[in-house]
Design a protein with these regions (language model features):
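Start-of-domain marker
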Residues: 21-78
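Residues on the lipid-exposed face of transmembrane beta-strands in outer-membrane beta-barrel proteins
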Residues: 31-35, 65-69, 96-100, 131-137, ...
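Predominantly the C-terminal beta-signal and adjacent terminal strand-loop region
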Residues: 147, 158-211
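Residues that define the transmembrane beta-barrel architecture of outer-membrane proteins
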Residues: 25-29, 59-63, 90-94, 125-129, ...
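Cleavable N-terminal export/targeting peptides
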Residues: 1-23, 210-211
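Detector for outer-membrane/organellar transmembrane beta-barrel domains
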Residues: 99-102, 106-153
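Sequence/structural signature of outer-membrane beta-barrel proteins
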Residues: 48-54, 74, 82-88, 116-122, ...
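Repeated loop/turn-to-beta-strand initiation elements of outer-membrane beta-barrel proteins
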Residues: 39-45, 73-79, 105-109, 141-145, ...
Length: 211
């Protein structure tokens, strides 16, 4: 659609700048399993692996279980729980949030907000609010492209500051019925509240099964 072209060009320029100026490049891969339960409830299990240092060394692996409930058509609430293993530590993360998706075929618009708490041994818990907006464009029955932006806010009694933002673009490919491949690129800047920020390229792939 013609009115999306300037937006895609802007995102492309930002991502191109990110690729050239990033401090590191990571790879993210995952496999997911999703099923629908009675009463409009969805259950999802994801297993992920992430590499850092120009995709040459282990960063983390994680297992995540998520349950979601569709309140009305397009509106959901969800609670994901994640257990992540790093080289020298483990982290547990629990989130709660909601999303709303509006279809305007062949486009769809989605807004998601969630509150996230991360626990780590001998460290104070880390609380964040994450807000994400995405636009999907259905090219044909099997192919869908998307762009998205996400901001992270530190959340405590004393401050509510931006700590990270991400810009992503990618493709969702329907391989077979109820099987989907996702290929994406993300540019993120983290530690915005610190004196030195990190700019990171992320190249990712995910495979999802629905039952």
């Amino acid at each position: 659609m013609k009115f999306l072209r300037p937006l895609y060009k802007l995102v492309f320029l930002i991502l191109l700048q990110g690729i050239n100026g990033a401090d590191d490049t990571e790879s993210h891969s995952s496999i997911g399993f999703e099923t629908k339960l009675p009463y409009s409830i969805e259950l999802e299990l994801d297993q992920g692996l992430r590499l850092k240092d120009q995709m040459s060394s282990f960063k983390q692996t994680f297992t995540q279980v998520s349950i979601a409930y569709e309140i009305i058509d397009g509106m959901k609430i969800f609670v994901p729980i994640r257990y992540a293993i790093f080289e020298d530590k483990t982290k547990q993360r629990i989130s709660a949030g909601g999303s709303y998706k509006y279809d305007l075929k062949p486009l769809s618009f989605k807004y998601r907000s969630k509150f996230q708490i991360t626990f780590e041994e001998n460290e104070p818990s880390r609380e964040l609010v994450r807000n994400k907006f995405s636009i999907d464009y259905k090219i044909n029955k099997k192919l869908k492209s998307y762009i998205s932006g996400e901001v992270f806010h530190l959340y405590d009694l004393d401050q509510y500051q931006y700590d990270e933002y991400r810009i992503s673009t990618g493709m969702n490919v329907s391989i077979k019925k109820k099987r989907q491949l996702k290929i994406f690129y993300t540019y993120k800047i983290e530690d915005l509240t610190k004196s030195s920020t990190n700019q990171i390229n992320i190249f990712g792939i995910g495979y999802n099964f629905k039952f």
